[in-house]
Amino acid sequence: MGTVNKPVVGVLMGFGIITGTLRITNPVRASVLRYDDFHIDEDKLDTNSVYEPYYHSDHAESSWVNRGESSRKAYDHNSPYIWPRNDYDGFLENAHEHHGVYNQGRGIDSGERLMQPTQMSAQEDLGDDTGIHVIPTLNGDDRHKIVNVDQRQYGDVFKGDLNPKPQGQRLIEVSVEENHPFTLRAPIQRIYGVRYTETWSFLPSLTCTGDAAPAIQHICLKHTTCFQDVVVDVDCAENTKEDQLAEISYRFQGKKEADQPWIVVNTSTLFDELELDPPEIEPGVLKVLRTEKQYLGVYIWNMRGSDGTSTYATFLVTWKGDEKTRNPTPAVTPQPRGAEFHMWNYHSHVFSVGDTFSLAMHLQYKIHEAPFDLLLEWLYVPIDPTCQPMRLYSTCLYHPNAPQCLSHMNSGCTFTSPHLAQRVASTVYQNCEHADNYTAYCLGISHMEPSFGLILHDGGTTLKFVDTPESLSGLYVFVVYFNGHVEAVAYTVVSTVDHFVNAIEERGFPPTAGQPPATTKPKEITPVNPGTSPLLRYAAWTGGLAAVVLLCLVIFLICTAKRMRVKAYRVDKSPYNQSMYYAGLPVDDFEDSESTDTEEEFGNAIGGSHGGSSYTVYIDKTR
């Protein structure tokens, strides 16, 4: 869907988890069967058909399939639409996945032009009796195409093209009157012998009024990606949810379609709860016999074929005469300015002396302002085989007069300001009015430095090397200036195998003469007194180590003697506000005669003698 000035959400093209009672309807036999909790009583169904659950892995859709005669082939594991029965329990877990938001990528990336919204009243449908139906065209205007019903049953209604291919979105606005019927007809394309699965979902707009009501607006996701789509306000989305109305599966057999009936699975209880009749579903058709306000909203139709084809359509159903919905206010999108440039190139090119080759910069652009000035410039610095790597400070291309770029360290291994580089070639387009294709319609003036002996091609984006000598090895930098400002930078190292060096692009300014490079850490060197003898240094180290060992030994002996004189155990003299006392592990012999009083006190405290057995005592003073 799209965006407006305040936060909005798009109508989701997927389907949520299926709940409720299934109502399976065979329109041809006019029989209605009800089953709860997805359990099918096959004894009550047609004995010539087998109904099996299956899951669309690409679109997280679930359904029941009337396999018919194909049931004799058991399960078709090669089909992307039929899953083995043991996977049936898993499809509900993934049923919450969606196609996406805002219909992004549908009919845009494929290069097809999106259809503009059309006003199609329910009265424009001439009815089944006449054999004539109104089909919206895909040529970007508001005209309609009238085709015969029999023609719609065979292949593509648009010039009879039977080649399967993805279709762009069909965006159709339908105006209806209260208590009148209306029919939604999808611009369907079918191929003989292909099994199709169609799904209908519905986003009601009953709770969405005023500015929150769904409306068709002009959406721009990017400067170059704009289209018409249905926009749903975020306040509306919080009060409503999308329902999957039904799913229909059938194999298209032309005029024999009536001999192989389709099966419709109604998976929504929305209209049952409102005590309204659910819409009638046929291949590519949704019918409502008596329109009430509960039927207004967004309907999404999706069709997939077993041959891999897919198409879908979005219908916005509103009251007839609703001027707000009929003539929606386009969303305010900022006018793009400036230009966008993107380049693809190799960062290195290895050659042999005498080779002829081309160095190309593949430039893609979108220019939003005209007239404009464009400068394409090639710069060069020689490479030093001892430099590993060469460093390109691209910041200096944007600030060529900065002091750090004009005076820096290691100038032979860096590329900084263009003022310090050699100009190889340049192409200028001045006061150009043609933003779509400036190379074809604008005058470009090129200049080549004769000392290099190179040839400029492709409007200034390609350098051709002929009988290349080794002296042309170097770092070549390509810069795009738009109206005097740097817009894009690219580089390539051209060298022989023997003198190849790598090049990297650095962010920020290069280090100055008094500043070490940020990427290297200077080594700390401890000065040594040249008058000190190695023998004296060795003696000093040995003496110091011996002193440390002796000190540690003395401390160890003192601690050991002290521990031999301490009490065998002691009671922690904790204050009485604590809840526990902790006693240690007693031993058999007590060498300290001064510990008798404490031991007796401890024995009396616990109500017995301590003896000589080992134990740990926890005394709770609260007892």
Swiss-Prot record:
Residues 560-623 are intravirion. The modification Phosphoserine is found at S593, S595. Keywords: Disulfide bond, Glycoprotein, Host cell junction, Host cell membrane, Host endosome, Host Golgi apparatus, Host membrane, Host-virus interaction, Membrane, Phosphoprotein, Signal, Sulfation, Transmembrane, Transmembrane helix, Viral attachment to host cell, Viral attachment to host entry receptor, Viral envelope protein, Viral immunoevasion, Virion, Virus entry into host cell. Disulfide bonds join C387-C413, C396-C405, C432-C442. Residues 352-499 are annotated as: Fc-binding. SUPFAM superfamilies: Immunoglobulin (SSF48726). Residues 31-538 are virion surface. GO terms for biological process: entry receptor-mediated virion attachment to host cell; symbiont entry into host cell. Its main location: virion. Residues 1-30 form the signal peptide. This is Envelope glycoprotein E. It comes from Varicella-zoster virus (strain Oka vaccine). The gene is gE.
